[in-house]
Amino acid sequence: MKTVGILIFDDVEELDFTGPLEVFGMAAHFGADCRTVTIAEQRKEIRCRHGLRVVPEFSLDDAPPLDLLIVPGGLGARTHARANAKILDFVRQQTGMVASVCTGALILANAGLLDGLTATTHHNSLDLLRQHRRSMRASERVSSSTIASRHRPA
């Protein structure tokens, strides 16, 4: 069974983690051999950006081995989470695939996972990503093989 972990933190954007949670939950419902878990720095209630309160299943210290870690964005990703040494260490230690949603890219950049790569994020945070000192390139549009990502206002 594959394990998908979704990192959550105070001021995480609800849609950024509930969207992937729903997608992988439905995949399991229709037969995919996977489970999805939520992970936070501690096993205590997280207050999301718009007031939703969530208690994670695991802390960073007791999280199971992951096949995929999803790092969502939100105000928390732009402020405290991207500078949290414990979160950055956890992200760095992942041996499976790692993906970000929106400003979760700032956490990946600070953890060094985007070194040598081109990455994008929410258009209002692109300058924050561009300020990153490591060898990465921030861009409005990124494409690789058959996947493309672009973030501009509608």
Describe these PLM feature segments.
Residues 1-98, 105-110, 127, 137-140, ...:
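Extended, subdomain-level signal for the structured scaffold at the beginning of enzyme domains
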